[in-house]
């Protein structure tokens, strides 16, 4: 399909099914209500077929173009992306490290002509996410490397159990691998006041009854409270990479990632990461 047919967010989003551009309509009220109900249940909402089927090949094409620019990392990490602390017991989840093989295309690869950037900067899109979350303070992430990114997962790669840095993450399934790549999560496992390390350890030990899984297909949009819900992606099977677009929003205006985590995820940091270090909305580990 000729990609020149796609110029803005309305060319990608199925606005008939999800009338983001009609906030005063009954249809809009329903999709907000439905999304809010899913989030209230377990902190996870999936909007099936959010992207028009005809537009998906263009998003895949764009992902194929930038995938070689992804920062690939092969290391061991814990759920908090923090350093080991030998003063803690060996069973503490902060001392439980797992192999991580992953790749992220930084946000500065997505200019205004790209589909992901067009969707992210579409004001009705931001307003809908804000309404679905019932957020009073809601801003686009100010991180120039991380506001709009693509996660590229190749054969054998995955993402071990972890918490997100920002409170609300919005992801778009663009392409699945031939197998694997299952999203698993333990909803609302911690709070801003309580890390609940034992509950985290139970998930890591595979003894927790809290873990759920969902199958996302290309075109599905997911709203997820990953700051408080432990989650992972199981290893991808087959030679076709898994592409997921990630749109990040926060409650603190001007917030960016920490220098340590930014370096881990994107292989580099910018002056803004050092300038704004410590600007956070809570006191959690990561």
Positions of PLM-derived features:
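Catalytic core of non-heme Fe(II) oxygenases with the double-stranded beta-helix
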Residues: 109-117, 126-221
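Signature of the catalytic double-stranded beta-helix
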Residues: 51-53, 58-66, 70, 89-143
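Short, solvent-exposed beta-strand-terminating loops
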Residues: 60-61, 65-83, 186
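Catalytic core of Fe(II)/2-oxoglutarate
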Residues: 182-188, 192-286
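Fe(II)/2-oxoglutarate
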Residues: 1-41, 269-286
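Long, compositionally biased
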Residues: 80, 86-90, 168
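Short, contiguous, helix-prone interaction/anchoring segments in small proteins
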Residues: 35-54, 58
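Hydrophobic residues positioned within well-ordered beta-strands of beta-sheet architectures
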Residues: 47, 168-170, 243-245
